[in-house]
């Protein structure tokens, strides 16, 4: 009888321990889409997975590549993904329609957008006005091209004098190299790496950043599905915190970050991702604004100006407010977003 009681007690204790363990290790599933392929600019998210930052927050994150920085909006709107990376300026235009889901950005990844026009130096295209009379290749789904109208307005270009050819992502840089177009619209680091990897020297490549000619826009941001955001605010908060930790870790340990990329993207190589990583960190991620205010910082006055600027080339029917587009309620404290001195002074 004593043995039976002892055995029952042991079984009860084991069962309780099992329940306790399953509760302790319960993970909230999160479906997350990147804006593009597994490449260095998004390495912080991959590092957060590989180094267990999401897991430590109780999140089970599924990470998928994307099809362009506009498509992420559709993925979140449909509910097929809880979170996605996308161009915040395209979100501004999307939210102009009150019938569309109330998607918001919860983390600004790209403080300075990579939107650019790339050409060969020999073409003589040195300023935006030089694009008049030229043939420009641009994928319709590209985030940079999505902001073309705002760019030509800000830069004083006569859009009627620029011929645009809709090209696919895979043939964009090859068409430039073959001389089939005079210039291409893209994220600068994508075209730079493609052309450099094809053997072109830095001095042969000309990049016109749209932001240098009057465009005050932000770039890619993390967007949240409204239903998921409302039902799982803590999961969103934890995801943002772990992601910022991932980007700071990637900045401190670039080789680890690039290794995280290459394990998911065997088609790329270390040299290409090292170039892409450096260009992204130097030109798009660590701006003066971020060094001063921390990763993920958004200047509300600047965002308001960007909404106004988009409206100069896009006719609003229901102009969105800042609160329709972005919220900082999911950001961790400033101390967790601060840029360490060693990174702030670093040239990648």
Regions found by a protein language model. Give the residues of each.
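Short, surface-exposed acidic
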Residues: 159-163, 202-206, 267-278, 316-325
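Secondary-structure end/capping motifs
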Residues: 231-315
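N-terminal export leaders
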Residues: 6-10
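N-terminal secretory signal peptides that target proteins for export/translocation
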Residues: 1-5
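Short, glycine-/small- and polar/acidic-enriched structural segments
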Residues: 26-178, 182-189, 208-210, 215-216
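Pocket-lining segment of extracytoplasmic ligand-binding domains
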Residues: 170-174, 180-270
């Amino acid at each position: 009888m004593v043995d039976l009681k002892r055995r029952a007690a042991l079984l009860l204790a084991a069962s309780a321990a099992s329940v306790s363990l399953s509760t302790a290790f319960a993970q909230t599933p999160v479906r997350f889409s990147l804006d593009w392929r597994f490449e260095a600019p998004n390495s912080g998210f991959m590092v957060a997975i590989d180094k267990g930052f999401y897991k430590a927050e109780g999140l089970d994150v599924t990470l998928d590549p994307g099809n362009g920085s506009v498509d992420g909006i559709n993925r979140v709107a449909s509910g097929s993904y809880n979170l996605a990376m996308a161009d915040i300026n395209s979100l501004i235009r999307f939210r102009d329609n009150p019938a569309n889901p109330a998607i918001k950005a919860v983390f600004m990844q790209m403080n300075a957008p990579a939107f650019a026009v790339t050409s060969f130096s020999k073409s003589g295209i040195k300023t935006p006005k030089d694009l008049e009379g030229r043939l420009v290749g641009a994928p319709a789904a590209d985030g940079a091209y999505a902001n073309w109208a705002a760019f030509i307005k800000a830069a004083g270009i006569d859009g009627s004098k620029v011929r645009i050819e809709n090209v696919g992502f895979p043939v964009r840089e090859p068409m430039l190299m073959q001389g089939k177009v005079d210039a291409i619209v893209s994220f600068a680091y994508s075209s730079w790496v493609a052309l450099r990897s094809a053997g072109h020297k830095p001095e042969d490549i000309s990049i016109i950043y749209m932001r240098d000619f009057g465009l005050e826009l932000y770039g890619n941001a993390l967007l949240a599905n409204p239903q998921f955001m409302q039902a799982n605010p803590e999961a969103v908060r934890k995801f943002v915190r772990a992601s910022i930790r991932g980007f700071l870790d990637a900045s401190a340990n670039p080789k680890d970050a690039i290794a995280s990329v290459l394990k998911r993207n065997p088609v790329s190589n270390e040299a290409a991702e090292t170039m892409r990583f450096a260009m992204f960190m130097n030109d798009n991620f660590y701006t003066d604004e971020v060094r001063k205010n921390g990763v993920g910082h958004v200047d509300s006055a600047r965002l308001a100006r960007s909404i106004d600027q988009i409206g100069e080339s896009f006719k609003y029917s229901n102009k969105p407010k800042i609160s329709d587009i972005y919220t900082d309620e999911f950001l961790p404290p400033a101390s967790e977003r601060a840029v360490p001195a060693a990174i702030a002074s670093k040239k990648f």
